[in-house]
């Protein structure tokens, strides 16, 4: 089990950080994920290279989503500053490090960040996201669009500062 932890804890911690901003909460979700992984490792079926990491990532994502749903302050349609509903061109991320981009994603409101991670990074459809989060597919699409708009503005602001 120690070898499993040493090999994958960093990757799983990164997944937690994409969904949850508070470091202590990230650690809690990582710990819960590892408990679930250790408890259910006997149900894992090897399906080729990368299947173990994918299986553990899915457990970690599910734990992060359960944590977010349990938060009383988590509302997918929470109070957020108004955003112009314009069509945003792809933001120019040239010159930005992966860490800078991830930091900007972490600064999104929780609902936007969750939908953005599931759609843009995990490759889920808006229908799958809606089912997982208990929202409508149109709400997922709207939140994704707003997340992209906010990220584009963050990138523009950041580039003006450098």
Specify the residue positions occupied by each region the protein language model found.
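A short pre-motif secondary-structure segment
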Residues: 115-116
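A short, charge-rich alpha-helical start-of-domain segment used by transcription regulators
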Residues: 1-14, 103
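Structural recognition of an alpha-helix C-terminal capping motif at a helix-to-coil junction
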Residues: 14, 28-35, 50-62
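Arg/Lys-rich amphipathic alpha helix in sigma70-family domain 2
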Residues: 43, 47, 57-78
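Sigma70-family region 2
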Residues: 18-21, 34-49, 70-72
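DNA-recognition helix of helix-turn-helix
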Residues: 65, 121, 127, 131-161
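Internal acidic/polar
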Residues: 66, 73-98
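Short amphipathic alpha-helical boundary/capping segments
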Residues: 100-109
């Amino acid at each position: 089990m120690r070898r499993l932890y040493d090999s994958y804890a960093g990757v799983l911690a990164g997944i937690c950080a994409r969904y949850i901003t508070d470091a202590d909460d990230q650690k809690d979700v990582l710990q819960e994920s590892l408990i679930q992984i250790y408890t259910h490792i006997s149900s894992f079926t090897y399906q080729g290279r990368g299947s173990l990491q994918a299986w553990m990532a899915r457990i970690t994502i599910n734990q992060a989503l359960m944590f977010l749903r349990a938060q009383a302050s988590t509302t997918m349609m929470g109070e957020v500053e108004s955003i112009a509903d314009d069509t945003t061109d792809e933001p120019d991320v040239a010159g930005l490090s992966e860490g800078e981009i991830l930091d900007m994603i972490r600064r999104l409101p929780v609902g936007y960040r969750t939908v953005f991670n599931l759609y843009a990074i995990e490759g889920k459809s808006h229908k799958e996201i809606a089912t997982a989060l208990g929202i409508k597919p149109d709400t997922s699409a709207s939140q994704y669009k707003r997340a992209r708009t906010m990220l584009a503005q963050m990138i523009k602001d950041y580039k003006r500062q450098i």
